[in-house]
């Protein structure tokens, strides 16, 4: 009974949260590769089957089992160091015209663009430039492609990392 009550409360909070949160949308088109001093590489996972085979990712998806559904339209991208997942996120790889930003339940036009979303940096690697690094590596991989990324307006570290990676502010979004 308590679990149902907690779940119901979470749904109510999530519903009202959509009305107060403000999102910022950034865009970037890179023509030339950016130089990076650190030898790093991003890894792309294209399917659930591929993720399940990867021993390194098992714990991530064990804790985030609902994210397996994203493989229908997206690729999982990550940066690793030894056996640690440093930073990760998703790239929508399906050719679709609109994208729903779940936090505010609002659709945006992404025709001929790739959307980057749900990025996360491991707590022990935060504030060390890894989020900026993974975004630059993604830009280098997708040269001459329009890339979009969004974050909450009050997530100052993310806004700083996104702009440091070369993304330009496009506009802010709210539910209404």
Describe the function of each predicted region.
Residues 1-66:
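Acyl-donor-binding surface of acyltransferase catalytic domains
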Residues 59-82:
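Active-site rim helix/loop that mediates acceptor-substrate recognition in acyltransferases
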Residues 72-73, 80-115:
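Conserved acyl-donor/pantetheine-binding loop and adjacent beta-alpha core of acyl/acetyltransferases
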Residues 94-96, 124, 154:
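Short coil/turn motifs at secondary-structure junctions
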Residues 118-141, 160-164:
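Conserved acetyl-CoA-binding loop-helix of GNAT-fold acetyltransferases
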Residues 142-154:
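Conserved GNAT acetyl-CoA-binding A-motif
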Residues 153-173:
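Conserved active-site alpha-helix within GNAT-family acetyltransferase domains
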């Amino acid at each position: 009974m308590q679990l149902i009550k907690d779940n119901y409360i979470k749904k109510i909070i999530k519903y009202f949260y959509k009305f107060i949160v403000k999102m910022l949308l950034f865009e970037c088109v890179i023509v030339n590769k950016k130089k990076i001093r650190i030898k790093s590489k991003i890894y792309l996972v294209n399917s659930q089957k591929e993720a399940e085979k990867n021993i390194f990712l098992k714990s991530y998806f064990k804790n985030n089992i609902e994210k397996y559904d994203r493989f229908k339209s997206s690729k999982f991208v990550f940066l690793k160091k030894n056996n640690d997942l440093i930073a990760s996120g998703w790239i929508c790889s399906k050719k679709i015209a609109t994208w729903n930003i779940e936090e505010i339940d609002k659709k945006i036009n992404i025709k001929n663009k790739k959307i980057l979303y749900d990025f996360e940096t491991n707590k022990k690697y935060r504030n060390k430039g890894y989020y900026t690094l993974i975004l630059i590596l993604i830009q280098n991989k997708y040269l001459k492609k329009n890339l979009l990324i969004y974050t909450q307006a009050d997530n100052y570290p993310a806004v700083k990392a996104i702009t440091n990676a070369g993304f330009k502010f496009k506009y802010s979004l709210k539910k209404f």
